[in-house]
Design a protein with these regions (language model features):
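Rossmann-like NAD(P) dinucleotide-binding subdomain of oxidoreductase/dehydrogenase enzymes
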Residues: 370, 398-500
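Terminal low-complexity tails and localization/encapsulation signals of metabolic enzymes
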Residues: 163, 174-330, 334, 341, ...
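Glycine- and acidic
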Residues: 1, 27-28, 84-88, 110-115, ...
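Long, K/E/R/D-enriched contiguous segments that form extended
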Residues: 4-51, 336-412, 423, 427, ...
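Generic, well-ordered alpha-helical scaffold segments in large soluble proteins
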Residues: 13-20, 42-49, 101-108, 128-135, ...
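Generic beta-strand/beta-sheet core signal
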Residues: 1-2, 31-33, 64-66, 115-121, ...
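Positively charged, amphipathic and often flexible ligand-engagement surfaces
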Residues: 1-253
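Feature representing long, continuous alpha-helical segments
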Residues: 96-103, 127-130, 156, 182-183, ...
């Protein structure tokens, strides 16, 4: 349970395995990290499980209690993903939670079914656990657990008191030493931190400034232990309506989905239920868009569900012929809706609204990507976040350029965006937003095999205020594609991928 992303799953797996009949009398243990607000609930769940197990004639289990061992990585991951850090915000809170869990774990009714491993090198925490166990008469259910070589005098003193001590010794073969470097660096980082006990432990004696510092640290944690909240800050819920982001001149990235929380896992199951077609429904017919009008063509491309073994048709999309392509180009060139006349501020507002709508349709975009291209949910999710970021970034950046001296922003005319199949959302959105942000009209020709995704996200832009004449989405045959790419009215082409 070292990484937060694995914590809830590991606990469920631990219980599921020990519930198997062959493991009824098997004594097993699991680690709980006190720096997580979830730790209290983890302990509660383990206590309920252990009591039912022992009452049913099964063996007790063990909980190894540590302060936490992945702080830096959790902080980095949370920052990159735009999520709240799952770790308690201060060392005092972490220490307080550790003491809270210690006291609860050493109570007689709890310790007899859920044995406790006290993993710490902090003399004050160790002494507190020792005195609690003496008070409750639960010393026999407790072990002290330490790392070899880090505070040997402490475990020797423990042994002299008759306490059971478990020493952990990292072992690595010479040829694998490189793999141990990250562990070594982490130990060095923790042990030299200003608030870490071991930093102040050398020549530690009562009535010294080091002793007083550590004693005060313990007293503050002890005073806080009964006043903690045990609610995880990871509360993202994709089942709720999206909260719109107002237009801003400061760019802030859209958070990815936190799949570690149960409510978002349920959200994924709902996506699957919605997008997995049985084959009995009539497939959707996606028309050809020619400006503000739509036409259903005889020549259509069929899309099968890439997530199913059976040939289930999801939809069919109309393909443009050469004459229709010429009409589409004419509309983009003449710009009847006047998109090129809009101000940068107007486009900035519309792009932010489009970003909000893209974020709100995240589930359907992911479902469409999974079904049409066979992407995984995680792959599709980060694409949606990137698309939302593009929609906000280009006009935000363009406003900064417009504020510079001797800079004048003019549209080029009509932009053709040709995008690949393997990134069916993020890359085409980036291309069309780059064009629209500059006041250009845009024709999007996505990869044919992934085009339904483009049709879906285009609705976000149209609904946000982009005229359909300013953003047209088409697929074509090769002959018509040549007409599109060689037309003099096309002033710029953004091409990513192959020649499809």
């Amino acid at each position: 349970m070292e990484e937060y992303k694995d914590a809830h799953f590991t606990l469920r797996l631990f219980k599921a395995v020990l519930n198997l009949p062959q493991f009824k009398n098997y004594s097993a243990g699991i680690v709980v990290q006190a720096y997580l607000p979830d730790a209290y609930d983890f302990q509660t769940e383990l206590l309920e499980f252990a009591k039912a197990r022992v009452d049913g004639g099964g063996a007790p289990i063990k909980m190894r209690l540590v302060k936490g061992c992945n702080l830096e990585m959790e902080t980095v991951i949370s920052s990159l993903k735009g999520w709240p850090n799952p770790i308690r915000p201060s060392k005092t809170e972490v220490d307080a939670n550790y003491l809270c869990l210690l006291e609860r774990g050493l109570m007689p009714e709890n310790a007899r079914v859920l044995h406790l491993g006290v993993a710490s090198h902090n003399l004050f925490s160790i002494a507190y656990a020792y005195l609690l166990a003496q008070k409750y008469g639960t010393t026999g259910y407790m072990t002290f657990e330490m790392l070899e070589g880090m505070a040997n005098h402490l475990w020797r003193a423990q042994s002299m008191l008759g306490n059971r001590v478990i020493l952990y010794t990292p072992v690595v073969k010479n040829e694998h030493f490189l793999n141990a470097v990250s562990y070594l660096v982490r130990r060095m980082d923790e042990n030299t931190a200003p608030d870490n006990f071991l930093t102040h432990s050398f020549n530690l004696k009562p009535d010294t400034k080091e002793w007083d510092f550590l004693a005060k640290q313990f007293e503050e944690a002890y005073a806080m232990k009964d006043h903690l909240t045990h609610v995880s800050p990871r509360v993202q819920n994709r089942n709720l309506p999206y909260t719109p982001v107002a237009p801003s001149d400061t760019m802030q990235n859209e958070p990815d989905t936190d799949f570690d929380v149960s409510q978002n896992q349920e959200w994924v199951r709902r996506i699957f239920a919605k997008w997995k077609k049985s084959g009995t429904e009539e497939p959707e017919i996606i028309p050809l868009q020619i400006g503000a009008e739509t036409v259903v063509c005889k020549n259509r491309y069929k899309y099968l569900d890439r997530c199913q073994n059976d040939e289930v048709c999801i939809c069919e999309m109309s393909q443009a012929d050469s004459a229709q392509v010429e009409k589409i180009i004419e509309i983009a060139e003449t710009d009847p809706a006047g998109w090129r006349k809009t101000t940068l501020e107007e486009r900035h507002r519309i792009m932010y609204e489009a970003a909000n709508r893209l974020a709100d349709m995240r589930g359907d975009l992911i479902g469409c990507m999974c079904a049409v291209t066979g992407k995984t949910v995680i792959e599709g999710d980060v694409e949606v976040s990137e698309a939302v970021d593009y929609a906000r970034f280009y006009t935000t950046a363009m406003k900064k350029f417009a504020a510079l001296d001797d800079i004048e922003i003019k549209p080029k005319g009509t932009i053709l965006v040709i995008s690949p199949w393997n990134f069916p959302c993020a890359i085409p959105v980036g291309g069309i937003v780059a064009g629209l942000a500059g006041g250009n009209t845009v024709i999007l020709k996505p990869a044919t095999v992934a085009a339904p995704v483009a049709w879906m996200f285009a609705k976000a832009f149209w609904d946000a205020g982009v005229p359909k004449e300013a953003l047209q989405v088409i697929i074509t045959n090769r002959e018509a594609l040549k007409v599109l790419t060689t037309a003099p009215a096309i002033k710029h082409i953004i091409l990513t991928g192959g020649t499809d």
